[in-house]
From Swiss-Prot:
<dbReference type="GO" id="GO:0035265">
    <property type="term" value="P:organ growth"/>
</dbReference>
<feature type="compositionally biased region" description="Basic and acidic residues">
    <location>
        <begin position="331"/>
        <end position="346"/>
    </location>
</feature>
<dbReference type="GO" id="GO:0045063">
    <property type="term" value="P:T-helper 1 cell differentiation"/>
</dbReference>
<feature type="compositionally biased region" description="Basic and acidic residues">
    <location>
        <begin position="386"/>
        <end position="397"/>
    </location>
</feature>
<feature type="compositionally biased region" description="Acidic residues">
    <location>
        <begin position="369"/>
        <end position="379"/>
    </location>
</feature>
<dbReference type="GO" id="GO:0045627">
    <property type="term" value="P:positive regulation of T-helper 1 cell differentiation"/>
</dbReference>
<comment type="function">
    <text>Transcription factor required for TBX21/T-bet-dependent maturation of Th1 cells as well as maintenance of Th1-specific gene expression. Involved in embryogenesis and hematopoiesis.</text>
</comment>
<dbReference type="InterPro" id="IPR052497">
    <property type="entry name" value="H2.0_Homeobox_TF"/>
</dbReference>
<feature type="compositionally biased region" description="Low complexity">
    <location>
        <begin position="413"/>
        <end position="434"/>
    </location>
</feature>
<keyword id="KW-0221">Differentiation</keyword>
<dbReference type="InterPro" id="IPR001356">
    <property type="entry name" value="HD"/>
</dbReference>
<dbReference type="GO" id="GO:0005634">
    <property type="term" value="C:nucleus"/>
</dbReference>
<protein>
    <recommendedName>
        <fullName>H2.0-like homeobox protein</fullName>
    </recommendedName>
</protein>
<dbReference type="GO" id="GO:0008283">
    <property type="term" value="P:cell population proliferation"/>
</dbReference>
<dbReference type="GO" id="GO:0001889">
    <property type="term" value="P:liver development"/>
</dbReference>
<feature type="compositionally biased region" description="Low complexity">
    <location>
        <begin position="123"/>
        <end position="134"/>
    </location>
</feature>
<keyword id="KW-0371">Homeobox</keyword>
Length: 476
């Protein structure tokens, strides 16, 4: 085996054999004649091992000894379906096994999923594509990224004849379609329903074959009533109102499908109020009003009791009292403002006294001031006894002057001077000894002093005053 050239396959270190077996002039009969292109620094990378010497017939193929032919026969017996070319391949450069173009009759039919898919799609290729691997060397194997298989589907690798990937316009929710006019809020309802129908019935992604679904998965999807057929969703559209359709879409298509509901159908979208306006009966309203007159703020136990009595909920009673307090507060403020305006209107008319009353009050006030001034002056000049005497004589003088004014025989003389004024009167009578009574009064500088006679008659004090009045008439 060592002389036949099989030793390098089992050596632990290839660098020991590279100089002897990879050079053009090796030791004795153990050297392999290689082409000039292969005479370079030996490399055992995966790419060099797979690609070196492929399709390049060595010019010194005959240089191989019989042991190399035996090696080729041995490899052919191990892999009967692989075509090995001894002249083109070196024992140091093993060639990967290529899948045969025709399956022999003795090949077992138990295939893996990938190989079965390969044989299933192989007849669809054109004859030129089938002859192409024979004319050209096979391309290097590429790393295939296999997606994890979903439940009920088989992963089918895309071959060279598969359809290209769909563009963004063909996708149901691609960027171009979302930005197009179909997702405009002013779009009609018919367009939305058409898109919904096409979404449910067709538009499956390329490369996914529903024929590969397992029976269990198919039965599972068929058991889902809301999304089994398009009619299950489109049937309520003619009978239910638009609001119910809106909520049905939201429940049926959560996530990215929600763009079909709120944004594309603004005419049908209408916000439903979370609460409705409560309508109270007359009995309930009277009960609430009566309780409000007694108690403006109701405690929680009282509120619950009142709600149970009137057949209302606790929240309804609470809201009613809040609104009623607000109304009562506004009415109270309006009444206070009205009273304030009314008082402001009455103040100019009732507060200022009239002109007639002002003129009537002024004379009386002046008279009172004059009396007070005269009394003050008299009290300063005279003693208290004189003041009393003067008051008594004033009353008697006033009475006698009235009597003398009516008498015909009375003589009244008056004279005035620069310093003051004085007047005197005299009368004669035949009573007694015929005494003449003379009275005089003078005022100087505002001071008044009166010196009446001791025998001056008065109406009240002397009963002979009528005779005094008649005496001048008899004498004349």
């Amino acid at each position: 085996m060592f002389a036949a050239g099989l030793a390098p396959f089992y050596a632990s270190n290839f660098s020991l054999w590279s100089a002897a077996y990879c050079s053009s002039a090796g030791p004795g009969g153990c050297s392999f004649a290689l082409d000039p292109a292969a005479v370079k620094k030996p490399s055992f990378c995966i790419a060099d091992i797979l690609h070196a010497g492929v399709g390049e017939p060595g010019p010194a193929a005959e240089g191989l000894v019989g042991a190399s032919a035996a090696l080729t026969a041995h490899l052919g017996s191990v892999h009967p379906h692989a075509s090995f070319q001894a002249a083109a391949r070196s024992p140091l450069r093993p060639t990967p096994v290529v899948a045969p173009s025709e399956v022999p009759a003795g090949f077992p039919q138990r295939l893996s999923p990938l190989s079965a898919a390969f044989h299933q799609h192989l007849p669809q290729q054109s004859p030129t594509q089938q002859q192409q691997p024979q004319q050209q060397p096979p391309p290097p194997p590429r790393a295939v990224s296999l997606q994890p298989p979903t439940s009920g589907t088989r992963v089918v690798p895309h071959h060279s004849g598969s359809a290209p990937a769909p563009s963004s316009k063909d996708l149901k929710f691609g960027i171009d379609r979302i930005l197009s006019a179909e997702f405009d809020p002013k779009v009609k309802e018919g367009n939305t329903l058409r898109d919904l129908t096409s979404l449910l019935t067709g538009g499956r992604p390329a490369g996914v074959h529903l024929a590969g679904l397992q029976p269990s998965a198919g039965q599972f999807f068929a058991s889902l009533d809301p999304i089994s057929e398009a009619s299950a969703i489109l049937s309520p559209l003619s009978s239910n109102p638009r609001n119910s359709v809106q909520h049905q879409f939201q429940d049926t298509f959560p996530g990215p499908y929600a763009v079909l509901t709120k944004d594309t159908m603004p005419q049908t979208y209408k916000r439903k109020r979370s609460w409705s306006r409560a309508v109270f009966s007359n009995l309930q309203r009277k009960g609430l009003e009566k309780r409000f007159e007694i108690q403006k703020y109701v405690t929680k136990p009282d509120r619950k009791q009142l709600a149970a009595m009137l057949g209302l909920t606790d929240a309804q009673v609470k809201v009613w009292f809040q609104n009623r307090r607000m109304k009562w507060r506004h009415s109270k403020e309006a009444q206070a403002q009205k009273d304030k305006d009314k008082e402001a209107g009455e103040k100019p008319s009732g507060g200022v006294p009239a002109e007639g009353e002002r003129e009537e009050r002024s004379p009386s006030r002046s008279e009172g001031e004059a009396e007070s001034e005269s009394s003050d002056s008299e009290s300063l000049d005279m003693a208290p006894s004189d003041t009393e005497r003067t008051e008594g004589t004033e009353r008697s003088l006033h009475q006698t002057t009235v009597i003398k004014a009516s008498a015909a025989g009375a003589l009244i003389t008056a004279s005035s001077s620069t310093s003051g004024s004085s007047f005197s009167f005299s009368s004669t009578s035949s009573l007694g000894s015929g005494n003449t009574h003379v009275g005089s009064a003078s005022s100087l500088g505002g001071n008044c002093s009166e010196l009446p006679s001791a025998h001056q008659p008065s109406v009240t004090s002397s009963p002979q005053s009528p005779e005094i009045a008649q005496a001048p008439l008899a004498g004349l």
